[in-house]
């Protein structure tokens, strides 16, 4: 009994750290999971951009959550392959959890609705300690694509809309920031500004919201705001993805911005989905 699952990356429109409400939009980078059911045990490999990744906490948490949800007792052999860099704010954990939940359910021969799969993945992420808010916004955008605005305190999808596949430039600095390192940080000082950004996104002005969110969180977390300023001067719409350090921009001239941003770090061009 084998199964396959696939889920994508996303970038942040509004980070939920400060208020519990957030939003993200899907981009065209992917994580794939293949599983084989076995009697017991959990073994396998995780490869991220060709490099081995040894942290299996999330895999073990997904297995535990699915066992509880289905009442099935099983082990797995797994193979996870991802295009999404880890610790950059590009929703690698959400994509891995979603893909693995889908793969295990397929192997079990049980159908699962997308929102239920997302909720199980979020539960696993909380169990594994790889999220602060539960990241229901990130997980929704990862699996469903498009723009997803959510209340992470209730795991509730408030709004979803399709987006055009416009170009996205990613700026991916060398350093990584694991979400667990931010636990206990008090974000209340920026909550009023992030509330305004979220309300703006709910009204349909999500591009404006992501710029405000990016500037506020960059200043608060100590990231440079120069990449956003550079993008704005070129007519792009730019923000900080998640906790960073990755930035992203929507632009009609991705090659131009990619060249400008290359002085800050590695860049890639992808698209919304």
Swiss-Prot record:
SUPFAM superfamilies: Ribosomal protein S5 domain 2-like (SSF54211)
Cellular component terms (Gene Ontology): cytoplasm
Recorded catalytic activity of this chain's protein: shikimate + ATP = 3-phosphoshikimate + ADP + H(+)
Regions crossing the membrane: none
GO biological process terms on file: amino acid biosynthetic process; aromatic amino acid family biosynthetic process; chorismate biosynthetic process
Signal peptide location: none
Entry keywords, A to Z: Amino-acid biosynthesis, Aromatic amino acid biosynthesis, ATP-binding, Cytoplasm, Kinase, Nucleotide-binding, Transferase
Superkingdom, natural source: Archaea
Record-listed ATP binding positions: 85-95
Gene Ontology MF annotations: ATP binding; shikimate kinase activity
Location of the protein in the cell: Cytoplasm
InterPro entries: GHMP_kinase_N_dom, Ribosomal_Su5_D2-typ_SF, Ribsml_uS5_D2-typ_fold_subgr, SK_arc
Top-rank EC class of the record's enzyme: transferase
Main location: cytoplasm
EC number: 2.7.1.71
Pathway(s) it belongs to: Metabolic intermediate biosynthesis; chorismate biosynthesis; chorismate from D-erythrose 4-phosphate and phosphoenolpyruvate: step 5/7
Family (UniProt): Belongs to the GHMP kinase family. Archaeal shikimate kinase subfamily.
Name by which UniProt lists this protein: Shikimate kinase
Annotated gene: aroK
């Amino acid at each position: 009994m084998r199964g396959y699952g696939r889920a994508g990356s996303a970038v942040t429109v509004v980070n939920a750290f400060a208020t519990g409400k957030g939003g993200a939009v899907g981009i065209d980078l992917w994580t794939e999971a293949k599983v084989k059911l076995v009697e017991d045990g959990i073994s396998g490999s995780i490869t991220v951009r060709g490099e081995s990744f040894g942290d299996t906490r999330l895999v073990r948490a997904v297995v535990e959550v699915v066992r509880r949800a289905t009442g099935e007792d099983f082990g797995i052999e797994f193979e996870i392959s991802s295009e999404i860099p880890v610790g950059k704010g590009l929703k690698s954990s959400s994509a891995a959890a979603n893909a693995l939940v889908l793969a295990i359910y397929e192997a079990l021969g049980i159908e699962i609705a997308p929102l239920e799969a997302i909720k199980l993945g979020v539960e696993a992420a909380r169990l594994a300690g790889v999220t602060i808010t539960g990241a229901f916004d990130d997980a929704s955008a990862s699996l469903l694509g498009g723009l997803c605005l959510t209340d992470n305190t209730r795991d509730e999808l408030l709004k979803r809309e399709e987006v055009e596949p416009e170009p996205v430039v990613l700026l991916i600095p060398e350093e990584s920031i694991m979400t667990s390192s931010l636990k206990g940080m008090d974000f209340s000082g920026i909550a009023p500004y992030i509330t305004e950004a979220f309300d703006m996104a709910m009204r349909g002005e999500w591009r404006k919201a992501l710029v405000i969110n990016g500037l506020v969180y960059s200043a608060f977390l100590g990231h440079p705001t120069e990449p956003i300023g550079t993008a704005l001067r070129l007519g792009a719409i730019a923000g900080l993805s998640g906790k960073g350090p990755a930035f992203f921009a929507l632009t009609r001239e991705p090659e131009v911005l990619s060249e400008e941003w290359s002085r800050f770090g590695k860049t890639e061009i992808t698209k919304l989905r």
